[in-house]
Amino acid sequence: MQVILKEKVENLGVLGDIVNVKPGYARNFLIPFGKAVQATKANIETFEAQKAELEKAEKARFDAAVATAEAIKDKVYTIAAQAGEGGKLFGSVGTAEVAEAVSQASGKEIEKSQVRMPEGVIRSIGEFELTIHVYTDVDADIKVNVVASEA
């Protein structure tokens, strides 16, 4: 199935590209999330008329993402969690806790799906390096310091 991309999609293309994808990927992901439209003759003509407007909106989203990344990168965010002897946590610190801590400290809205934890959830006290995937091609490296809570 051919679709016209309305924004940059990782491993697929950029705004305005006409690409071939599997029908299920188009119907279940690209089209419902507003990332693409089916490449019919009418849609191609409509897209060409709106291309400048869409590029301007994409640039605004990208600039906002870069500003967010600059505001949160290279900082240390502290999360308090209950811990036992030896620094082992009761439970774990996951993406939701990291996203909440970064959002509260920076004032920028970060979703838990944007937090990248390559080694999985944090289960001990210490300082850990994580990545926040703000937007396509925009990542911010942060440090999370997990400390024992006073409980």
Swiss-Prot record:
Keywords: Ribonucleoprotein, Ribosomal protein, RNA-binding, rRNA-binding
Example GO molecular function: rRNA binding
Keyword Isomerase (UniProt): no
Gene3D superfamilies tied to this protein: Ribosomal protein L9, C-terminal domain, Ribosomal protein L9, N-terminal domain
Keyword tRNA processing (UniProt): no
GO cellular component, one term: ribonucleoprotein complex
Superkingdom field: Bacteria
Disulfide bond sites: none
BP GO terms, sorted: translation
Function recorded in the entry: Binds to the 23S rRNA.
Family per similarity comment: Belongs to the bacterial ribosomal protein bL9 family.
Full protein name: Large ribosomal subunit protein bL9
Organism name: Francisella philomiragia subsp. philomiragia (strain ATCC 25017 / CCUG 19701 / FSC 153 / O#319-036)
Gene coding for it: rplI
